[in-house]
Amino acid sequence: SNTLVYGHTCVMTDFETSVYKALAYLIESGHNQIGLLVGQETTADNRPLQTDPRYMSFKHYLEEKELYQPDYIRVGHFSSDSGYDMMKELIDELGNRLPSAFFMASDALAVGALRALQEASIPVPDRVSLISFNDTSIAKHVYPPLSTVTVYTEEMGKQAIHSLLQDLQRGDSGIPTMHTLATRLTIRESTR
């Protein structure tokens, strides 16, 4: 998360561009009804920390395109169980009005949602396309393999270590900086 506001250097993913690319791909593929499953990080006493930047980017982009539908959005936790529960709820509530595509804020959410869709005999990607976020190892090992936003976590770690070493060499923390890394949209079999 963005620690720059607290006076600390941070290394982040470019969430906004990442979400915009994923949504643009879905829209170009003919999807006009796009849902979102996202987690909410909380403190130890269950107070929300901040609104997830993927949610904010999703909302902003689809509002600009006049495609934003709040009924298609669920906020839970960043877990496969939460993804399963949220998708099951949407299937039960929306039935045939279920969106033709979903953006998932994490691979774990997508794995749970995929299971709920499969249990309801809703074919992916023929009826519902999915794009997730992170490209963890599980994304390519589920069926169908998940289209996902690839986050370069190893490079993020290298950038963080480099910044820390620079601070140590200077003997102070210097001026805090923010390093934002790009992502790549990796298309697999969960979208069409």
Identify what each model region corresponds to.
Residues N2-R192:
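Bacterial carbohydrate/catabolite-sensing allosteric modules
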